[in-house]
Design a protein with these regions (language model features):
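Alpha-helical substrate-recognition element adjacent to the catalytic core
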Residues: 1-111, 115-116
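A short glycine-/small-residue-rich loop at the edge of a beta-strand within enzyme catalytic domains
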Residues: 62, 122, 126
Length: 166
């Protein structure tokens, strides 16, 4: 199984596009700035609420994004030899347009809690170490895993995959 982080690896960063669209610099913060992902998401949701932004604003930003140069060709090539899984800290509620552009690989990510008017009230993390847990689960049922990502929070799961191959 070939496992990839999505944003920064195959696609641009969604929150950077939200920052560009809204002019709100705070949306550019990443886990480099706020290492705890829960704290980072709480910060982003507070920014959204204080600026009266909802899920449609994020979806509009995502609809403007395309895959990074070469990502589609890379995925098409690797699918000939591997099952592809996207292990991402993104959310199902706005990842769909990018999944379509990638040819609908399996996406393992989080969910948002959205009310009827489109306001984001919270989020549901699958697990605090979901990427690492997914790799370990695949390995526990006999799969060899390759993994790639672009950020500090990818180190645990990419090193777990590398350990298995050595």
């Amino acid at each position: 199984i070939a496992c990839f982080d999505m944003e920064g690896t195959l696609t641009p960063e969604i929150w950077e596009q939200v920052a560009l669209d809204t002019g709100i610099e705070g949306f550019n913060k990443t886990t480099r700035d706020i290492p705890d992902y829960g704290e980072l998401m709480d910060f982003r949701l507070e920014l959204m609420a204080s600026n009266n932004l909802g899920i449609s604003d994020i979806q509009n930003a995502v609809n403007k994004l395309d895959l990074l140069d070469g990502a589609k060709d890379f995925l098409d090539e690797i699918k000939e030899s591997f099952q592809v899984v996207i292990l991402s800290d993104t959310f199902h509620e706005f990842a769909s347009p990018l999944m379509k552009k990638m040819g609908y690989p399996l996406l393992l990510c989080h969910n948002l809690d959205i009310d009827q008017d489109g306001s984001i009230k919270g989020y549901k993390l699958r697990h605090t170490k979901a990427k690492q847990q997914a790799i370990e689960a695949f390995q526990s049922i006999g799969y060899q895993c390759l993994a790639a990502g672009d950020s500090y929070n990818c180190l645990l799961y990419t090193s777990d995959a590398a350990d298995e191959l050595t």
